[in-house]
């Protein structure tokens, strides 16, 4: 039988072709199985884990180092950066639990967007009927030595906002937009010794969660409470001006654990700027704090804040969802709350006795308002 001879050149070409094919296949597998944090647009082909396990992929920001599962950040003079993430029906886990092993220089964020950044996450862009879920968990380290900011770390589920706004730049240029078309679950957040929040917004931010936002009971905690007013835990936190948060529905039930300082909290600007135009909209769901706890509120709002729970966009009519609420509402002058109790809805609680702001309650047939709230008394501005 005659055998075909293969030249050395042909052999080299064949070997090179096989090597290229193998490398191409290997690269594809690595892309599918990547556990690196996300900082660019991406389409999933399988369930995705974004994990911080070392000090790579954590760029220095202006004030502290950041570890984030999804990070949107550009320098002040850069153009707006857009990150589009299509989960394509797969689940996304943002695991920042190993940040605690990196030392006291790092705070942890599931999703962090600031400085001219737009982030859009779609659960399934082409087939909305097949949806995935985003799960967030994070831990940071506390150090008993020193008093510098680097010694006191924080953990946040979702943090949005433009820190440059403190220098009074234009809102239109600085607005940080984050849209999440998926359900989000906060599984665990353990901060070092300063604010730990499920959601945090700071100046010129627009966050929309078009899905269900859940904080599991007892998920938020601190390792060490040692900085007075700065040692706080919040479900949703706002500070500064021009912040908008919209959530289709929420499930935050802290009625048994009592681990939250306040479920919803807003503060005035820390830098002497205006505190105004802050809006929170929640379509319905469960929002509960542990009753009979001194100075722990369902809502604790500084001036310039409006919140809408199960009401329409302008607060003129009741919504169509159910709301299960528990806790006291405290509002400073210049702030307003709009609460809608449809059939099957319930609010156990009331307002702080010396409330300065306004609470507008919509109570339809079948809704229930129970004011047995530790004797604090209630004053509803409009009923």
Predicted regions: what is each one?
Residues 33-62, 66-326, 331-349, 355-368, ...:
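Surface-exposed loop/turn motifs in large extracellular/passenger domains
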Residues 17-25:
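Bacterial N-terminal signal peptides
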């Amino acid at each position: 039988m005659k055998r075909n001879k293969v030249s050395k050149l042909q052999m080299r070409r064949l070997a090179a072709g096989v090597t290229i094919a193998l490398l191409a296949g290997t690269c594809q597998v690595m892309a599918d199985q990547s556990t690196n944090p996300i900082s660019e647009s991406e389409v999933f082909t399988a369930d995705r884990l974004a994990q911080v396990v070392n000090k790579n992929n954590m760029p220095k920001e202006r004030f502290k180092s950041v570890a984030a599962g999804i990070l949107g950040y550009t320098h002040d003079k850069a153009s707006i950066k857009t990150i589009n993430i299509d989960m394509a029906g797969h689940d996304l886990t943002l695991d920042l639990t190993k940040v605690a092993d990196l030392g006291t220089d790092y705070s942890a964020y599931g999703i962090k967007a600031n400085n001219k950044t737009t982030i859009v996450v779609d659960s399934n862009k082409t087939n909305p009927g097949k949806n995935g879920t985003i799960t967030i968990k994070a831990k940071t380290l506390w150090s008993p030595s020193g008093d510098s900011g680097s010694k006191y770390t924080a953990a946040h589920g979702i943090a949005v906002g433009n820190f440059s706004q403190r220098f009074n730049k234009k809102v239109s240029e600085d607005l940080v937009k984050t849209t999440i078309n998926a359900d989000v679950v906060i599984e665990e957040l353990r901060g070092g010794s300063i604010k730990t929040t499920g959601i945090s917004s700071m100046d010129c931010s627009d966050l929309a969660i078009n899905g269900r936002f859940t904080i599991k009971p007892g998920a938020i905690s601190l390792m060490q409470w040692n900085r007075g007013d700065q040692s706080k835990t919040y479900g949703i936190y706002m500070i500064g001006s021009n912040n908008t948060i919209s959530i289709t529905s929420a499930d935050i039930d802290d009625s048994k654990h009592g681990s939250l300082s306040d479920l919803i909290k807003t503060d005035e600007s820390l830098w002497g700027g205006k505190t105004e135009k802050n809006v929170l909209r929640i379509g319905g769901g469960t929002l509960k704090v542990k009753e009979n706890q001194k100075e722990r509120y369902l809502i604790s709002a500084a001036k310039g804040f409006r919140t809408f729970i199960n009401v329409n966009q302008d607060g003129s009519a009741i919504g169509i969802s159910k709301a299960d609420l528990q806790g006291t509402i405290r509002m400073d002058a210049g702030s307003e709350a709009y609460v809608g109790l449809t059939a099957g809805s319930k609010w156990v609680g009331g307002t702080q006795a010396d409330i300065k702001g306004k609470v507008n309650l919509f109570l339809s047939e079948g809704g229930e308002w129970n004011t047995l709230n530790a004797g604090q008394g209630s004053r509803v501005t409009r009923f």
